[in-house]
């Protein structure tokens, strides 16, 4: 599958690149970002996938989070895909910021209008990793995932639905229990229909209750001043309770004074990369 390089910039001794390709799963052109650390010049590196939140493209993380120095030092290839298919001309796709374009929610849609293109779960867990493994110096056996908000939800479900595939998982302000929040209800109804039992297959709080192992150490940072926390969109307490019940280790850090923004992510990104490097470089 042909990759077209869109951009390449040197950063902390490595290269921040963006590529475009024709996606089989999403049936449209997709862009994704890839950071190749200096170590990638001489051998295969572990790979860390970042999943972004609502309204984002592949650009937000690479331009705002300041992750490059830590990724360079730890020798990690970092992949950041877009958050939805683009330009599919589906009725209603552009109507709201929390559904359709920029809001794929990392599910495989089953509703007629969306099921042909909106297959972000299969894209980020199957098609994109295959593409990355085939085209870049990565070790497919050493892979981890993290994300923010809707992408934090994505990271958690990808890890929980694929035991052993990802060495570690972390999230910033994730939607932990989307079947119970407004964003989740809207997205799941649109993409998956009204049968709520189908929704549970993409809800971290439900998935963790039936997670069979191997052990997964989960790191979550949450800003205490996050408007979406107080608004009931994120519901981390429900997820932590489910983890505790299942004896799955989760480090949850409520960060005083921080909000939902990339300033919050930039503050703690090095901690998260260190968390993943511990497992990826073991």
Curated annotation (Swiss-Prot):
Hydrolase recorded as keyword: yes
Sites bearing N-acetylalanine, chain numbering: 2
Enzyme class: hydrolase
Gene Ontology MF, one: carboxylic ester hydrolase activity
Family label: Belongs to the esterase D family.
Function summary: Serine hydrolase involved in the detoxification of formaldehyde.
Protein name (record): S-formylglutathione hydrolase
Chain's gene name: ESD
């Amino acid at each position: 599958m042909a990759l077209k390089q869109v951009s390449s910039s040197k950063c902390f001794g490595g290269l921040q690149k963006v590529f475009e390709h024709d996606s089989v799963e999403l049936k449209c052109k997709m862009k994704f970002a890839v950071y190749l650390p200096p170590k990638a010049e001489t051998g295969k590196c572990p790979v860390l996938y970042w999943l972004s939140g609502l309204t984002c493209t592949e650009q937000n993380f690479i331009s705002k989070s300041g992750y490059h120095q830590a990724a360079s030092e730890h020798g990690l290839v970092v992949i950041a895909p877009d958050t939805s298919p683009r330009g599919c001309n589906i009725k209603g796709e552009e109507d709201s910021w929390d559904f359709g374009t920029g809001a794929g929610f990392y599910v495989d849609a089953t509703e007629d209008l969306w099921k042909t293109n909106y297959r972000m779960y299969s894209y980020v867990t199957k098609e994109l990793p295959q593409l990355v493994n085939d085209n870049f110096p990565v070790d497919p056996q050493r892979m981890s995932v993290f994300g923010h908000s809707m992408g934090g939800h994505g990271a958690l479900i990808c890890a929980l639905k694929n035991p052993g595939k990802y060495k570690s998982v972390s999230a910033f302000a994730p939607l932990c229990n989307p079947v119970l929040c407004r964003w989740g209800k809207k997205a799941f109804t649109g993409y998956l229909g009204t049968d709520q039992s189908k929704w549970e297959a993409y809800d971290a709080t439900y998935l963790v209750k039936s997670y069979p192992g191997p052990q997964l150490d989960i790191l979550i940072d949450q800003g205490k001043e996050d408007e979406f926390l107080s608004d009931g969109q994120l519901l981390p307490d429900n997820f932590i309770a489910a983890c505790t019940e299942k004896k799955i280790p989760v480090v949850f850090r409520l960060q005083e004074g921080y909000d939902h923004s990339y300033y919050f992510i930039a503050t703690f990104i090095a901690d998260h990369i260190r968390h993943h490097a511990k497992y990826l470089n073991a």
